[in-house]
From Swiss-Prot:
Binds 2 [4Fe-4S] clusters per subunit. The gene is hdrC. This is H(2):CoB-CoM heterodisulfide,ferredoxin reductase subunit C. Part of a complex that catalyzes the reversible reduction of CoM-S-S-CoB to the thiol-coenzymes H-S-CoM (coenzyme M) and H-S-CoB (coenzyme B). One of its GO terms (molecular function) is CoB--CoM heterodisulfide reductase activity. It is an enzyme of class 1 (oxidoreductase). Its EC number is 1.8.98.5. Residues 25-55, 68-99 form the 4Fe-4S ferredoxin-type domain. Transmembrane segments: none annotated. The keyword Iron-sulfur applies. Signal peptide: none annotated. It comes from the Archaea. The keyword Iron-sulfur applies. It comes from Methanothermobacter thermautotrophicus (strain ATCC 29096 / DSM 1053 / JCM 10044 / NBRC 100330 / Delta H) (Methanobacterium thermoautotrophicum).
Amino acid sequence: MTLLQREENIIRKGNIDKEFSEKIKAAGGDSLEYCFQCGTCTGSCPSGRRTPYRVRQIIRKANVGLKDEIISDPALWMCTTCYSCQERCPRKVKIVDVVKLARNEAAKAGFMAPAHKAVGSFVIKTGHGVPINDATMELRKAVGLGELPPTTHQFPEALEEVQKIIKATGFDQLIGYNWETGELE
């Protein structure tokens, strides 16, 4: 069997989502069409060195409109949004904007990395993606700061406001947060 005979390498018209392609192109501007697949983005990606995340593949699939392939790929969530790819792109493609939009579409379709859901759960519970711990409180005291930063940790009423916003936007449902148990479903 040759490479051209492999079924998974064939792009079929039915796999192309033109609406998704247009959304992606709107997020990345006209620049997305200028990508000539040089690989600078993938070569500069710190996450791509240690994970299966390949920026160039995402951009190529986005250009074609392969929505299902992009949003169902767990590697989509391995981007740290450090902008290394975008800063080095010789064609000025808005790569990170494309990745963010693809993640939004993935989340709406029920594809979200468990680690990202866990961070969302921390935000719901504490108002922070990374809750403060004893070691951090001790370090804050050691450098002359109060144990708690002036955030939801100090102002519980602010956490109530954060939670109202979360409920109003449906973020809790998006990540599968159960208010009764305080856990993800």
